[in-house]
């Protein structure tokens, strides 16, 4: 079982490394998101580059990247320790993809896919927190940052055995938003609807 647990964790990283934002833009002949807009291969930048439908497809793909390895792990009944590792490596794959020179997205949708499989309450908290923040202030990045700080508290309450991986994932999300935090501080961050 340890062998399969390690295999799933490795699979999670490689699946996470498939960047839907880059591939979809390449197939549909949109600009490379790494060289356009915020230069982030994530759904918010895709929204600005290619529109809502393409952005939604990127979000769905990124959610599945996080959810599929976790579902597989649950099905094979691997231990919570390896499930936690699978969760972290899914997000690491998205953020630092081996197929794209380790330059990836910020992991929000993939983290959502991971946390949804851990506990439905966590996905509800993520959606609510992100939506309320974005509707209040208009910044997708701020929604992600606020949610990253909040979600470990709920993980501790609902699924305490996954608190550590949740803290690691949340920390990674905040780290990947370092440039956004600087722009927010200096009032230079673009709102979600601005191209």
From Swiss-Prot:
GO terms under biological process: phospholipid biosynthetic process
Chief localization: membrane
Enzyme class at the top of the EC tree: transferase
GO cellular component terms, semicolon-separated: plasma membrane
Topology with respect to the bilayer: Multi-pass membrane protein
Organism of this sequence: Blochmanniella pennsylvanica (strain BPEN)
Entry keywords, A to Z: Cell inner membrane, Cell membrane, Lipid biosynthesis, Lipid metabolism, Membrane, Phospholipid biosynthesis, Phospholipid metabolism, Transferase, Transmembrane, Transmembrane helix
Reactions it catalyzes: an acyl phosphate + sn-glycerol 3-phosphate = a 1-acyl-sn-glycero-3-phosphate + phosphate
NCBIfam families the UniProt entry points to: glycerol-3-phosphate 1-O-acyltransferase PlsY
Subunit composition and interactions: Probably interacts with PlsX.
GO molecular function: acyl-phosphate glycerol-3-phosphate acyltransferase activity
Enzyme Commission code: 2.3.1.275
Pathway note: Lipid metabolism; phospholipid metabolism
Function: Catalyzes the transfer of an acyl group from acyl-phosphate (acyl-PO(4)) to glycerol-3-phosphate (G3P) to form lysophosphatidic acid (LPA). This enzyme utilizes acyl-phosphate as fatty acyl donor, but not acyl-CoA or acyl-ACP.
Family: Belongs to the PlsY family.
SMART domains associated with the record: G3P_acyltransf
Parts of the chain that traverse the membrane: 2-22, 54-74, 80-100, 107-127, 132-152, 155-175
Keyword Ribonucleoprotein found: no
InterPro entries the UniProt entry points to: G3P_acylTferase_PlsY
Protein name from the UniProt record: Glycerol-3-phosphate acyltransferase
Subcellular location as annotated: Cell inner membrane
Classification via Pfam families: G3P_acyltransf
């Amino acid at each position: 079982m340890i062998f399969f647990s390690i295999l799933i964790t490795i699979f999670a990283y490689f699946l996470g490394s498939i960047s839907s934002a880059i591939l979809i833009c390449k197939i549909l002949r949109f600009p490379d998101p790494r060289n356009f807009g915020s230069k982030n291969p994530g759904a918010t930048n895709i929204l600005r580059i290619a529109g809502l439908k393409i952005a939604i497809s990127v979000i769905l793909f990124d959610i599945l990247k996080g959810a599929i390895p976790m579902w597989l792990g649950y099905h094979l009944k691997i231990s919570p320790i390896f499930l936690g590792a699978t969760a972290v490596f899914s997000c690491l794959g998205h953020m630092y993809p081996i197929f794209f020179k380790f330059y990836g997205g910020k992991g929000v949708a993939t983290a959502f896919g991971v946390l949804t499989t851990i506990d439905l309450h966590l996905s509800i908290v993520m959606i609510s927190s992100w939506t309320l923040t974005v509707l209040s202030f208009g910044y997708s990045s701020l929604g992600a940052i606020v949610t990253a700080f909040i979600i470990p508290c709920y993980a501790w309450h609902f699924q305490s055995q996954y608190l550590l991986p949740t803290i690691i994932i949340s920390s990674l999300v905040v780290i990947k938003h370092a440039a956004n935090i600087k722009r927010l501080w200096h009032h230079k961050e673009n709102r979600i609807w601005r191209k």
